[in-house]
């Protein structure tokens, strides 16, 4: 990359696909899988009791993340699979499903009153990579009748 390209903040196609990185920071990939239940939740404690699992995060509508942040618009109960962020995405998904598989019917009933989804996260400092999820790891989406979507953040 020449100096004028560097100043514009972009790389040639050859540089992008060569695996050369502009920084000395090692390439990383991080993943997560979270079951989210949100909307108007009458009782977080009751929900937690019925699921038999403590949420990794929860909040009520009107609460704030910090003093200067906007208030939350809805209640949230969420559980993130306890997997090392560097493990492949399918490990996160499989762990999440193994936690909630036996609670499927209750989650389907909940969907009639509140939103239930699976939030997948993919974060990397590499702008020329992808991810792969084996078909065997897609059962949670089929069984809970929720879309497969991934939040992708490249830093």
Task: Name each region found by the language model.
Residues 1-131, 135-136, 143-153:
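Acidic (Asp/Glu-rich) sequence patches and key acidic residues
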């Amino acid at each position: 990359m020449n100096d004028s390209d560097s100043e514009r903040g972009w790389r040639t196609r050859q540089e992008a696909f060569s695996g050369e990185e502009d920084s000395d920071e090692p390439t990383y990939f991080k993943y997560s899988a979270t079951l989210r239940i949100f909307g108007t939740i009458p009782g977080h404690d009751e929900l937690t009791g019925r699921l038999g699992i403590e949420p990794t995060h929860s909040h009520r509508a009107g609460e704030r993340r910090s003093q200067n942040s906007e208030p939350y618009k809805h209640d949230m109960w969420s559980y993130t699979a306890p997997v090392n962020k560097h493990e492949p995405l399918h490990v996160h998904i499989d762990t999440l499903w193994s936690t909630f598989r036996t609670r499927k019917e209750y989650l389907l009933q909940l969907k009639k009153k509140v939103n239930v989804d699976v939030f997948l996260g993919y974060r990397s400092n590499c702008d020329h990579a992808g991810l792969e999820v084996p078909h065997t790891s897609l059962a949670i989406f089929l069984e809970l009748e929720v879309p497969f979507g991934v939040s992708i953040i490249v830093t």
